[in-house]
């Protein structure tokens, strides 16, 4: 993997479960790789500021949270998922972009440190101090909603960039359907997009989506996974 737009910095402050809420069933994603893919999407964008970024399989919102912390050009982040328990975690993670949300997390970590005296909680408090500079104020918003991205999405939404990591569990549950749910997802996402919408999908390397409504701009294999980047064909 050749990194063009994201330096090999120390991203330990963004580790899942440290400050950002995580868990055994909560998907995360390599920070540098996610940021590289997002910034490759930016290269193809005509407008590069005040962006609405959407993840239709957001899980606990880890990827969107990290991207919004690292990229001030994102002014609205939107996540949807079919699992309401994941959306609850995503809401908590999205709140970390606000002073109030980060203050609440700081209090939680302080209480854990006082109760258990673990170094990991002290390290998390130190990371929280580092992340505080990435908090947003003013024109920044976030929201989540319940949705099956293979079906019509009722929410009013016009994303500038869509980025999603298709969880392995989704691929397993989608097997055997009359029509590829992955293809259905591409079709539904195209309906809500405009001609300058860029889509990045990370998936199993064996997946071969038809991607109706999208023009592929690039693809790259990552071990057993791959990502593909597209521009919407709507006009």
List the predicted regions and their residue ranges.
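Class I S-adenosyl-L-methionine-dependent methyltransferase catalytic core
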Residues: 1-235
